């Protein structure tokens, strides 16, 4: 809707907010992973690609690299203990997200990161 309105300033704000959200998400999930496992688990980047996501992907990947992430194969990720119950169907089901593990262990959840601008407030 920003593009349809020709709102270039809001588009730039949206792009910066996109990267801000990704950066804060890195801190949130790394903190949670370290609280639960004492380490970074191999994270999976799942994206539903729209026009903005496609445009931002190079900057997003640069952000991940600058924060020390490496890109590995799904096979390497699945070999980690965290994903064991998702890949070995002989095992009982277990939470497949860090929040689920924290809840199962009765560990308080950290606060969700807050953005400086709510994307829904743009281009109305």
Describe the role of every protein-language-model region.
Residues 1-39, 53-56:
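Alpha-helical scaffold elements lining the catalytic groove of polysaccharide deacetylases
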Residues 39, 49-124:
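C-terminal domain-boundary segment and adjacent tail
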Residues 42-46:
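Structural preference for beta-strand elements that scaffold enzyme active sites
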């Amino acid at each position: 809707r920003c593009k349809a309105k020709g709102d270039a300033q809001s588009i730039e704000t949206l792009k910066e907010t996109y990267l801000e959200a990704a950066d804060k998400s890195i801190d949130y999930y790394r903190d949670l992973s370290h609280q639960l496992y004492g380490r970074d688990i191999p994270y999976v980047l799942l994206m539903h690609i729209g026009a903005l996501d496609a445009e931002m992907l190079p900057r997003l990947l640069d952000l991940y690299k600058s924060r020390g992430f490496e890109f590995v194969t799904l096979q390497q990720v699945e070999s980690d203990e965290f994903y064991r119950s998702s890949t070995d169907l002989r095992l009982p089901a277990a939470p497949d997200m860090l929040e689920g593990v924290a809840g199962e262990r009765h560990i308080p959840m950290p606060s969700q990161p807050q953005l400086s601008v709510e994307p829904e407030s743009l281009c109305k």
